[in-house]
């Protein structure tokens, strides 16, 4: 049992040395504050806020585990999907949704470059990189759709001459 614990400790130390520092955009997401719950929040909004806060707490915990070499990249990708998805659901206005999606896309673009380097260095798998790329393309599609809906909404709101 002691040998097993020692092996886990050594693995964590080695993984920590190999784990690259998180990018500024990722750190901004991880360091974001929890959303304040208000007594007069409608029940659905309250649930959406609680879900976002749970996702943010999980993200903070998973990134802490990553920094200690105790979690894998797919878990970080999955938690980021949940976190950004929960944040998008907090907003009704298409332009606010688009802002969140743009931030998510910016994080994924930065993460893709970092992950590509890790794959080249043998520290991550090609499968992890392709999963991130799939998610990035999905966000690009969602962002394009959100911008098109926002543009359609604005053009319909404009009076005709």
Q: At which residue positions do the language-model features occur?
A:
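Amphipathic alpha-helical coiled-coil segments
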Residues: 84-98, 137-153
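Short, solvent-exposed, mixed-charge loop/turn linkers that connect secondary-structure elements
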Residues: 125, 152-157
């Amino acid at each position: 049992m002691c040998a097993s614990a020692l092996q886990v400790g050594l693995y964590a130390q080695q993984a920590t040395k190999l784990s690259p520092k998180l990018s500024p955009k990722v750190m901004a997401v991880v360091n974001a504050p929890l959303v304040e719950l208000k007594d007069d929040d409608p029940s659905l909004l309250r649930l959406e806020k609680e879900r976002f806060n749970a996702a943010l707490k999980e993200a903070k915990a998973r990134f802490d585990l990553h920094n200690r070499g105790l979690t894998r990249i797919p878990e970080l990708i999955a938690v980021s999907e949940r976190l950004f998805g929960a944040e998008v659901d907090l907003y009704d206005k298409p332009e606010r949704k688009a802002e969140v999606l743009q931030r998510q896309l910016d994080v994924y673009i930065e993460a893709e470059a970092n992950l590509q380097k890790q794959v080249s260095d043998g520290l991550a798998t090609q499968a992890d990189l392709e999963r991130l790329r799939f998610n990035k393309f999905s966000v690009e599609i969602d962002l394009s759709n959100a911008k098109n809906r926002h543009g359609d909404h604005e053009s319909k709101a404009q009076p005709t001459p």
